[in-house]
Amino acid sequence: MFGVLNSNDHRAAVQQRNIPAFGRTSFEPWTDNPTSNYRCETGGNGRDSGQNRVRRPMNAFMVWSRDQRRKVALENPQMQNSEISKQLGYQWRMLTEAEKWPFFEEAQRLQAMHREKYPDYKYRPRRKALPQKSDKLLPAASSSMLCRQVLVDEKWYPFTYRDSCSRAAHSPMEDQLSSSRPVNIANSLLQQEHHYRSTSLGDSPETLAAHLSADPPFYPKEQLGLSDAYFP
């Protein structure tokens, strides 16, 4: 009932079935056909997503480096693509105009074919991604210097406050001047306080000294920016 198949016939039938399937699934990234550059690719930036994007026609350098890149990659399998591109660019610059001329002619022919095949083609370069700005760190600029006023005995006295970021960018001379400024403010405030009390109170010097020692003036060091409360 069942016929016996010959082993040679069975092997030939299997090979005949596998050859078309292999031909459909095989892919060669580098081909010698210049028209392979016109194949459309899917993807790209946001506006080309999901649509077929037409590649630009090859220029003279691309025509020349198409075979040279494969040759360098086979000779140096450990070399990265960026290094291969640098080496190819150096070799291209070393060629003479006579050596480059055949590749320019081939590039012109490919561009003419590209214009005939895609008459409405327009080159649209991809947009470069802009670096994201971070607002976490503020630069040590003049904006970090805060000018405030202190109310002492119904009078406003300006003073300057600097944060830790701007203080690190100042010179030693500026630090010395800024450290001596609060002391001068304290001295002037004391002198004004003594003058105010001496004019408002018509008492003897002994009574005035006793009153000052019993009721010293209060100057908050947080507002004045003093490291230590210094009073002569």
From Swiss-Prot:
<keyword id="KW-0221">Differentiation</keyword>
<keyword id="KW-0112">Calmodulin-binding</keyword>
<comment type="similarity">
    <text>Belongs to the SRY family.</text>
</comment>
<dbReference type="InterPro" id="IPR017253">
    <property type="entry name" value="SRY"/>
</dbReference>
<dbReference type="GO" id="GO:0005516">
    <property type="term" value="F:calmodulin binding"/>
</dbReference>
<keyword id="KW-0804">Transcription</keyword>
<dbReference type="InterPro" id="IPR036910">
    <property type="entry name" value="HMG_box_dom_sf"/>
</dbReference>
<dbReference type="GO" id="GO:0016607">
    <property type="term" value="C:nuclear speck"/>
</dbReference>
<protein>
    <recommendedName>
        <fullName>Sex-determining region Y protein</fullName>
    </recommendedName>
</protein>
<feature type="region of interest" description="Disordered">
    <location>
        <begin position="196"/>
        <end position="215"/>
    </location>
</feature>
<keyword id="KW-0238">DNA-binding</keyword>
<dbReference type="GO" id="GO:0005737">
    <property type="term" value="C:cytoplasm"/>
</dbReference>
<feature type="region of interest" description="Disordered">
    <location>
        <begin position="24"/>
        <end position="53"/>
    </location>
</feature>
<keyword id="KW-0726">Sexual differentiation</keyword>
<dbReference type="Pfam" id="PF00505">
    <property type="entry name" value="HMG_box"/>
</dbReference>
<feature type="DNA-binding region" description="HMG box">
    <location>
        <begin position="54"/>
        <end position="122"/>
    </location>
</feature>
<dbReference type="GO" id="GO:0000978">
    <property type="term" value="F:RNA polymerase II cis-regulatory region sequence-specific DNA binding"/>
</dbReference>
<dbReference type="InterPro" id="IPR050140">
    <property type="entry name" value="SRY-related_HMG-box_TF-like"/>
</dbReference>
<keyword id="KW-0805">Transcription regulation</keyword>
<keyword id="KW-0539">Nucleus</keyword>
<dbReference type="GO" id="GO:0030238">
    <property type="term" value="P:male sex determination"/>
</dbReference>
<comment type="subunit">
    <text>Interacts with CALM, EP300, HDAC3, KPNB1, ZNF208 isoform KRAB-O, PARP1, SLC9A3R2 and WT1. The interaction with EP300 modulates its DNA-binding activity. The interaction with KPNB1 is sensitive to dissociation by Ran in the GTP-bound form. Interaction with PARP1 impaired its DNA-binding activity.</text>
</comment>
<dbReference type="GO" id="GO:0005634">
    <property type="term" value="C:nucleus"/>
</dbReference>
<keyword id="KW-0010">Activator</keyword>
<dbReference type="GO" id="GO:0001228">
    <property type="term" value="F:DNA-binding transcription activator activity, RNA polymerase II-specific"/>
</dbReference>
<dbReference type="GO" id="GO:0007548">
    <property type="term" value="P:sex differentiation"/>
</dbReference>
<dbReference type="GO" id="GO:0030154">
    <property type="term" value="P:cell differentiation"/>
</dbReference>
<dbReference type="InterPro" id="IPR009071">
    <property type="entry name" value="HMG_box_dom"/>
</dbReference>
<keyword id="KW-0963">Cytoplasm</keyword>
<comment type="function">
    <text>Transcriptional regulator that controls a genetic switch in male development. It is necessary and sufficient for initiating male sex determination by directing the development of supporting cell precursors (pre-Sertoli cells) as Sertoli rather than granulosa cells. Involved in different aspects of gene regulation including promoter activation or repression. Binds to the DNA consensus sequence 5'-[AT]AACAA[AT]-3'. SRY HMG box recognizes DNA by partial intercalation in the minor groove and promotes DNA bending. Also involved in pre-mRNA splicing.</text>
</comment>
